Amino acid sequence: MQLTAENLACVRGGRDVFRGLSFAVKSGEALMVTGRNGAGKSSLLRMIAGLLRIASGTLALDGGEQDAAIGEQAHYLGHLDALKPALTVAENLQFWAEFLGPSSGDVAPALAAVELTALADLPAAYLSAGQRRRLSIARLVAVPRAIWLLDEPTAALDAASQTRLADLMRRHLASGGMIVAAAHGAIGLERAREVKLGTAA
């Protein structure tokens, strides 16, 4: 599997955010998107996920035309954790597993992967910021998809949780998955190639 971008351009509010961006990511590879605030890192991930319109250029999976196929193969982990406060930890993950599907229906392994098993019956309203982030990361495990689009994935995570995330990412790549991540610092993807965006919005 290969994700290819050719001459991508992003325009927000009538202004160029970036233009002429090209890259390719194959199975087992990771791409780090870096750049200052406003350079378009989050916008690029949203474009790949199909959540933001591409001003010009193309995105293709395995050489096909851009369509819903990329979004169907991708997990997008953005800044918002998108949790329902009244639902328990397990219920929140079950909701997302059913929404994103198909999944096995058993969210216990995903909760264990982010060490939230002990909090499975706790309403999400009582979670700390780091625990909420870990619950969002659990979606990556609960519903396997080939492409992980991670926007500042280590935000609010303590050192132990960052180590667990790095291990999950390494396993994903080893199994043939791919990762495109946006971050200001290291997130545990030592062998990732880098694309630096330099044009402020």
Regions found by a protein language model. Name each.
Residues 49:
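Helix-to-loop junction immediately C-terminal to a conserved catalytic motif
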Residues 54-72:
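Conserved ABC transporter NBD signature motif
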Residues 80, 85-100:
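Q-loop/switch helix immediately C-terminal to the Walker
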Residues 104-120:
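Conserved ABC ATPase "signature" region
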Residues 123-130:
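Conserved ABC ATPase signature
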Residues 137, 176:
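Hydrophobic anchor residue at the start of the ABC signature
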Residues 148-152:
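Catalytic Walker B motif of ABC-type/P-loop ATPase nucleotide-binding domains
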